Amino acid sequence: MKSAEWFEASTEEERVEIQRKVARKVRLEPLDDVDAVAGVDVSYRGEEYRAAAVVLDPETYEVLDRRVVHGTTDVPYEPGFLAFREGPPALEALEGLDFDLLFVHGHGVAHPRRAGLASHLGVALDVPTIGVARRPLVGRSKEEPSRIGDTTPLVHRGEVVGYLVRTDAEARPVVVSPGHRCNLEDAVRWTLRLVRVGKWPEPLRLADLLSRRGASRVEGESRGAGVRR
């Protein structure tokens, strides 16, 4: 299938079938060397969207590349089917960018059919992806992690599908799950490694800023942020 075809469905039955195909393609495996990390996010105002992607050097946090696209969509938000709304704008924003790992504001395999937005994008582009979300879509955890760096497994149908990860002492934990070509351990490790300010990994934080506020703000934020210890 071509990249865009992973997101083309007109009925719920078609969306579910595509998700099942995505889940069958997903591979959870250790990451190879990572020299460039991307983040992608989509912001909305009504039916209008602004999708942004930012590529960083994971050692220096230098912004290596970025891209913003605008458009409209008539695909509504439905829990469990976010990929069909945000996937096409995200694909467009990522077009032409080079990176070794992609962070996605959404879920990977921590999804009812193991096929969240991060898994969709990973399979469509055949790149390693990690999903980072605000709250669980599926699964249960025994407790919230209490200290920065602590994690708690998220279990769904007897399987660990992700982790609650405490990345900020003042904010709720994020939900981390691998999307494609990445395993659970590397998803957590890279998420914690790349948090500098607030609760989100830096590629996602800057992609969110770019989608909402523009390139000049991203450049200033990137230069001014200190590395968290």
Swiss-Prot record:
Main location as per UniProt: cytoplasm
Cross-referenced InterPro entries: Endonuclease-V (IPR007581)
Enzyme Commission code(s) on record = 3.1.21.7
BP-aspect Gene Ontology terms: DNA repair
Localization annotation: Cytoplasm
Q: Cite a GO CC annotation.
A: cytoplasm
Q: Name one GO molecular function term.
A: single-stranded RNA binding
Q: Give residue numbers for the site Interaction with target DNA.
A: 77
UniProt entry keywords in alphabetical sequence: Cytoplasm, DNA damage, DNA repair, Endonuclease, Hydrolase, Nuclease
Q: Name one Pfam family in it.
A: Endonuclease_5
Which superkingdom? Archaea
Q: Where are the transmembrane segments?
A: none
Catalyses:
Endonucleolytic cleavage at apurinic or apyrimidinic sites to products with a 5'-phosphate
What does this gene product do?
Answer: DNA repair enzyme involved in the repair of deaminated bases. Selectively cleaves double-stranded DNA at the second phosphodiester bond 3' to a deoxyinosine leaving behind the intact lesion on the nicked DNA.
Name the protein family.
Belongs to the endonuclease V family.
What protein is this chain from? Endonuclease V
